[in-house]
Swiss-Prot record:
Top-level class of the enzyme under EC nomenclature: transferase
Phylogenetic placement of the source organism: Bacteria, Bacillati, Actinomycetota, Actinomycetes, Mycobacteriales
Pathway: Cell wall biogenesis; peptidoglycan biosynthesis
Name this polypeptide is given: UDP-N-acetylglucosamine 1-carboxyvinyltransferase
The entry's keywords: Cell cycle, Cell division, Cell shape, Cell wall biogenesis/degradation, Cytoplasm, Peptidoglycan synthesis, Transferase
Gene3D superfamilies documented for this protein: Enolpyruvate transferase domain
Subcellular location field: Cytoplasm
UniProt-listed InterPro entries: Enolpyruvate_Tfrase_dom, Enolpyruvate_Tfrase_sf, MurA_subfamily, RNA3'P_cycl/enolpyr_Trfase_a/b, UDP_GlcNAc_COvinyl_MurA
UniProt-annotated binding residues for phosphoenolpyruvate: K23, N24
Native source organism of the sequence: Corynebacterium jeikeium (strain K411)
Residues involved in UDP-N-acetyl-alpha-D-glucosamine binding: R93, D305, I327
Catalysed conversion reaction: phosphoenolpyruvate + UDP-N-acetyl-alpha-D-glucosamine = UDP-N-acetyl-3-O-(1-carboxyvinyl)-alpha-D-glucosamine + phosphate
Entry's Gene Ontology cellular component terms: cytoplasm
Amino acid sequence: MKDSFVVTGGTRLQGAIKVSGAKNSVLKLMSAALLAPGTTMLTNCPEIADVPYMAEVLRGLGCEVELDGDVVRITTPESIEYNADFEAVRQFRASVAVLGPLTSRCHKARVALPGGDAIGSRPLDMHQSGLELLGATTKIEHGCLVAEAEELRGAQIKLDFPSVGATENILTAAVLAEGTTTLDNAAREPEIVDLCNMLVAMGAKIDGAGSNTITVEGVDRLNPVDHEVVGDRIVAGTWAYAAAMTRGDITVGGIDPQHLHLVLEKLKLAGAQVETYPTGFRVVQNERPKAVDYQTLPFPGFPTDLQPMAIALCTVSEGMSVITENIFESRFRFVDEMMRLGADASIDGHHVVIRGREQLSSAPVWSSDIRAGAGLVLAGLVADGKTEVHDVYHIDRGYPEFPEQLRSLGAEVERVQR
């Protein structure tokens, strides 16, 4: 039996909520703990399914991992394994983040090709080419990515695309390499800055985090640290869209609003009133939202992970919207599920055209990935009757206690087994 959410539409969401640490950061920080023998403690960790998955990966590499609410303690031995267990790795995409630390510490890594969300091709060629420029050899063998290096040396590296995952693996490989590494066209996401902040606290020498060019001067050894995970901007953005969709009033804490600057500007264009604070923001929507166009881009552009929420809002907005997806080619798969709910949408390659309706109609729908599932739940909040969202194990991988948090804002949502 699998869990589903039953969402009853028609409630205006109101209240305050605090987001926990970012899913897209905590898993990479856990991997970075491999770089430093001793005990690393991460606080403000989200209690999501992917954290125990990553804990299993690290245990398979020889670490001791303790999960205690929003605290994760990782004790890394002086000698670690280099072979990441297939059964643990195949559960989720972020497991490939151990590639850089293992290549750095062990001079060898064997990581099973990862699983995760079905949102399109996410090749590892930039991870491989980056490690090769640092002196490693890489190959795909028996379903695993294998990297080997007698030693790693700093290099000039320019990414074809500002890939978050490739940036992370190159950084974690370069911090213990001999010499200086310059990474051009690096990803600029807040999660990259969070990783760099932790690595610097561990003793790494890194300049330029948050810019297009990051410079790393290799050091001999890193030390374990205590580190607070940065707030989850995607979860925070989801709550912002929930407010706009339900014509609600939600205050979100635990997040730097600058991490969502463009998102909040788009909501203003849709008619929302937005107030920002040093550690949060408030979104109030009193009238029917206005149609807004979107195109996804790497940070500081509009995040692809919030595209499903933007589409959900557009389905009930006044006017026509065009959404362009520039990151993942299969991210519009969930639009078919939105059409089950009555959305007037048509897909043309990397674009979807949406003509807003006054209201959606309830129907059974199926989640194909974390963010699509959240978007379908938001759509259910404005559909008539009860909407059943199936395969919500995807949502559990990215949203801590999602039904409980929705109920705290006044939504009618329950978890059931079918």
